[in-house]
Amino acid sequence: FSQKIRAGKNAQLTDDFMIIARIESLILERGMEDALKRATAFVKAGADGIMIHSRKKDPAEILEFCDKFRMVNTETPLVVVPSSFNTITEEELAVHGVNLVIYANQLTRSAFPAMQDTAREILKYHRAKEVDDRLLPIKDIITLIDTL
């Protein structure tokens, strides 16, 4: 994987582009040492950041990784995705050297139940009037588009 990172960095045309290397060692239960070894190799290959991920609900192994990584590297941005370990705050993560928190699927997962409820109501009444109070006005959607 280091070769792919190196190739990506060699092909980079602008500083506005970053390569963030995702470490799957903890998810695959390959251990902390494997995760740290990969992170070090990926940074050496040119990765601009490291993303560490875990499927455990307890954030302890993520914090352990962050602390150990920060002992040898204080500069490279650290990224986490707290989908499983969702009790930890951004502030707590920052104390352990995390620079970026990605909420990868929470918005999508929360939107689906609302869409299902709306679809049920439309199917039940064969019209959309009953769901009007749940809808974002079109003018607000246009405002959102204009700000992009």
Placement of each model-derived feature along the sequence:
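Extended, intrinsically disordered, low-complexity segments
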Residues: 106-148
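Alpha/beta enzyme core
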Residues: 1-101, 110-120
